From Swiss-Prot:
A three-component membrane-bound flavoenzyme that catalyzes the formation of hydrogen cyanide, a secondary metabolite, by transfer of electrons to a cyanide-resistant branch of the aerobic respiratory chain. Contributes to suppression of black root rot of tobacco. Heterotrimer of HcnA, HcnB and HcnC. GO terms for cellular component: cytoplasm; plasma membrane. The lineage of its organism: Bacteria, Pseudomonadati, Pseudomonadota, Gammaproteobacteria, Pseudomonadales. The keyword Transmembrane applies. One of its GO terms (molecular function) is glycine dehydrogenase (cyanide-forming) activity. This is Hydrogen cyanide synthase subunit HcnC. InterPro entries: FAD-dep_OxRdtase (IPR006076), FAD/NAD-bd_sf (IPR036188). It comes from Pseudomonas protegens (strain DSM 19095 / LMG 27888 / CFBP 6595 / CHA0). Induction: Transcriptionally up-regulated by Anr in response to Fe(3+) in oxygen-limiting conditions. Stimulated by glycine. Belongs to the FAD-dependent glycerol-3-phosphate dehydrogenase family.
Amino acid sequence: MIKHYDVVIAGGGVIGASCAYQLSKRKDLKVALIDAKRPGNASRASAGGLWAIGESVGLGCGVIFFRMMSANRKREAQGSAVVVDSSTPHILPQSFFDFALQSNELYPRLHRELMGLHNMDFKFEQTGLKFVIYDEEDRLYAEHIVGCIPHLSDQVRWLDQAALRASEPNVSHEAQGALEFLCDHQVNPFRLTDAYTEGARQNGVDVYFNTNVTGVLHQGNRVSGVKTDVAGLFRCTTLINAAGAWAAELSLQATGIEIPVKPVKGQILLTERMPKLLNGCLTTSDCYMAQKDNGEILIGSTTEDKGFDVTTTYPEINGLVQGAVRCVPELAHVNLKRCWAGLRPGSPDELPILGPMDGVEGYLNACGHFRTGILTSAITGVLLDKLVNEEALPLDITPFLARRFATAPVKKQPEPA
């Protein structure tokens, strides 16, 4: 049986769900959200940080990633392990700052909307983010961050050791202070995806879980639908690729071009519930921590090039544990509830891939968000809704178009409609 929709969204993670929710508010579009429910979606590798500045300047799992990459490059160049110079922070382009900050600003209203209209609470909390400083290397890193973002000086605050202890009494005495980002907050990453999905469903979106897209249909240079393994054929006017770490495969099927999105493994762990231990989100050069509303603390996250592997490994989990205990010694006495791994959709420049592909109609990208999918899901949904409806965009997406990559098309016989 053939199903007919205006929009089919392939991928029901936080990005696809946000797109579905924003499109559903139109009421005049017929929308399908298709998700394979495969293990390893990117939300599983997230602590739910809305760290618009923190992630833009390479903190959170970004600082772990940057230090790993820097060490690897220096080993390749010098043939031996070296100390990474943390005085050169990994700053993303201004276009990403604009993208992330606009998304962050949407969350208070979005939270009220999903709570009020759909009774879905994704636990938005205004916590701030503190980069904990242990030594001179960390301080140099923080100073260079501040030097790179003078236009955001009102959103950062230095905390000396006494101020940090007053704000976070359980932080180690080893910490010399912190750099705090006042507009960076948090949500529950799993509840956020559920909230988008349920809001979309209540607004009339048809949701197909445990369903794989197995092929893409074409009429000339236009995408006209998809084939699935268990739900049959879907005809559509627009296909949105929100397939996360699997987006390259869908792009190849739809356009003949394999966009450069690959899985980046992130291991994370969760503690038992406990009384309030952290007043805000913390990030160090070893890990990040976020205590949720139920008392559990999420500790993350590794950044590994391991393909689609989602197994957990002792050395990496132990490294996160040691980093967390170094920052908050009380955690040495806490039980771990579980650990797991998720797959972030990484792109070569760490920026998302959004919008149309040259020469192909009826197809839009919404993928490649790497470590910032939770943060930027809100603005991505808004942008894709406006792209589908051919309306003016709230920001320029030129830096995020797939054409920035010199990717040659792969010859692939398109499936006819």
